[in-house]
Amino acid sequence: MAVDDVLKTAAARGRQMGLPYGGALTPAEAHEVWRNAPGAKLVDVRTRAEWDYVGRIPGAVEIEIVTYPGGRPNPGFMAELESKVDKAAPVLFICRSGGRSHNAAMLAAQAGYTAYNVLEGFEGDRDAGGHRNTVGGWRAAGLPWSQS
């Protein structure tokens, strides 16, 4: 599917969900847009601990939206975003399962970015056994990631 078609689908999904930003992408759609839309950035808003111990997406911009430990909002989030990401290009936000990235997309949209949330996040929802990484998410979709 062409990038424009993917973004139209994401925008329609976002309207259906009542989202106050550009739209919502599946992990596979996000990967397609990130790789093929000029200037698009994937911003991983998980914590440093998650990047270090759970895994990273090679080439993603990493900006914590909450700090670890403590889980407090990162007061420098928007300043860091503005220093690393051009407002003229699509910005795709991802976290563990979609909640923090939704908040990041809302903040970015308020600041003038064309923002999208990556549904399911990096790890996806829990399966019947209570484990992540098997039901939805970037990793379960077989998209690029690494672990230290």
Where do the protein language model's features map onto the residues?
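Short, surface-exposed ligand- or partner-binding patches at beta-edge/loop junctions that are enriched
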Residues: 93-94
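Rhodanese-like catalytic fold shared by cysteine-dependent sulfurtransferases
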Residues: 1-39, 48-90, 101-148
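Structural scaffold elements adjacent to functional motifs in cytosolic proteins
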Residues: 42-44
